[in-house]
Each structure stands twice: as C-alpha cells, then as structure tokens.
Amino acid sequence: MKRSYQALEPTLFFLMLMVIWEISARMIGQPYLLPSPIQIVMRTIDLSESLFFTHLPATLAIISIGLALSIVLGILLSLLMFWNERVERAVYPLLVASQTIPVIALAPIFVLWFGYSIWSKVAVTVLLTFFPITVNTYDGLKSTNRQYEELFYTMGATKRQLFYRLFVPSTLPSFLTGLRIAVPLAVIGAAVGEWLGANEGLGYFSRRMMTQFDGPGVFAPIFILSLLGILGFAAIKKLENILLPWRKKQ
C-alpha cells in the first residue's frame, strides 16, 4: 500500500501543478503570455500534422546523431585518460573548461561554421552531452577495485579478458548514469540549436510561433520536447534495471 502511494505521489503533484497553472492562466486571461495547459494541448492537436511529421523527425535526428557522437567521443576520451596520465592531465581541464562557456554564445558560431545544416545543431548537442558521459565513464574506470584486478592477473587473465570481464562491467553503472543525464541535455541542445539557426525542428517551430504572438503555439513544441526528455530518461532508467538488476533491488 505504501509503495502504491509513493508511486502515485508524483502524478498527484503534477496534476496539482496543472490545476494551479490552468487557474492562473484563466485569471490572467492573456494566452499569448501564459496559455493554459488545455489551450496548449488543443493547439498541439491543431498543429499535429506539422509538429509530428515535419519538425519532430528533424529534432529526433539531431538528438540521435548528437548522442551517438557523444557516446563514441566520451568512451574514447575516458579510455585515453584512463590509460595515459599525461592525456588525463591535458584533457580533463579542457573538458571542464568546455562546460564554462555558455552554449547560447557558441550556437551562433556553429551556425556560422556549418550554416543551417543539421551539423550546427548536432555540434550544440554534442557540446552539452559528451561531458557527463565522458566524466562518468572515466570515474567508473578509475573506481574499479584494484584487488579484483590483481586477482584476475593472478588467475592468468590477459589484458583483453581483464578489460571485458572486469572494467566493462564495473564501469557500466557509471556510464549509464552519465547517459541518463545526457539524454535530457540532448533535447535541450537540439532545441537551442534549432531556436538560433534552423529551418525546421521543434525549437525552430516554437520561435516561429513566437513571432506570430501565438502563445499556445510557442508552448506546443516545448510540451513535446519535455515529453521527449522524460521518455528518454525513463528509457535509460529501464535499461539500467535490465542490465543492472541488483541496483533496482538496492
């Protein structure tokens, strides 16, 4: 009974927020400033063909390519830093420095370099997502129990066996944690990139609706972007429960 109530708590809190939002929007009475949730849903339905068949696929492509590149870059960088201390001393500060630069300032530069092609938006997405993947994977490699490593060597394991039988399983929880953080950031990166320079995508569509003072139209793609982030986060969490069942029990 207690678990059922705990599972219900987030839903009740969300519904309470929606009721407060609906009442506040009706009291203000200016949809172009603060549309109500019902108005946003109705506008999403009205614009569904354009949103779901033109702009959503464009945004999903940016998110998918950006995440894939971030995973590859993150794993390669974390392995290089783990295997070579000089690389770690040289690269790690640059990783941290890359996160101190506002993405909103770099996005126009990417548009200047890559134009309105998909790659300017992918660059923004990679900039936001590769850091948590790299750092978490590297920390996972560093936290591998050295006693287990010595035990593997004592039992005659090769370096290849050591990597796949020890380092990969011990690093997987940290990698998945980084990926879980990166997925919502990928949605943000795609939206920011589209907002600043694109001719299609949910971020672009939201900006276009803003120029028309269409409040519900501005929020409609934001609503879809939020759902994408939540679904992506939940999918990685589900993958964690499948690959790491002991963590779910804990």
Curated annotation (Swiss-Prot):
Domain annotation ABC transmembrane type-1: ranges = 56-237
Where located? Cell membrane
Transmembrane ranges, per UniProt, are 5-25, 62-82, 94-114, 115-135, 172-192, 216-236
The UniProt entry lists the main location of this chain as membrane
Top-rank lineage group of the source organism: Bacteria
For this UniProt record, give its keywords in alphabetical order, as a comma-separated list: Cell membrane, Membrane, Transmembrane, Transmembrane helix, Transport
Task: Output one GO BP term.
Answer: transmembrane transport
Kindly give the Pfam families that the UniProt entry links to this protein. BPD_transp_1
Q: How does it sit in the membrane?
A: Multi-pass membrane protein
Which Gene Ontology terms of cellular component type are present? Answer: plasma membrane
The answer, when asked if Ion transport is one of the entry's keywords, is: no
- Biological or metabolic pathway of the protein: Cofactor biosynthesis; thiamine diphosphate biosynthesis
Instruction: State whether it acts alone or in a complex, and with which partners, per the record.
Output: The complex is likely composed of an ATP-binding protein (ThiZ), a transmembrane protein (ThiX) and a solute-binding protein (ThiY).
Function of the protein: Participates in a thiamine pyrimidine salvage pathway as part of the ABC transporter complex ThiXYZ involved in the import of thiamine degradation products such as the formylaminopyrimidine N-formyl-4-amino-5-aminomethyl-2-methylpyrimidine (FAMP). Is probably responsible for the translocation of the substrate across the membrane.
Which family is this sequence assigned to? Belongs to the binding-protein-dependent transport system permease family.
Q: Which PANTHER family match?
A: ABC TRANSPORTER PERMEASE PROTEIN HI_0355-RELATED (PTHR30151:SF20), ALKANE SULFONATE ABC TRANSPORTER-RELATED, MEMBRANE SUBUNIT (PTHR30151)
* Name of protein: Formylaminopyrimidine transport permease protein ThiX
Q: Name the source organism.
A: Halalkalibacterium halodurans (strain ATCC BAA-125 / DSM 18197 / FERM 7344 / JCM 9153 / C-125)
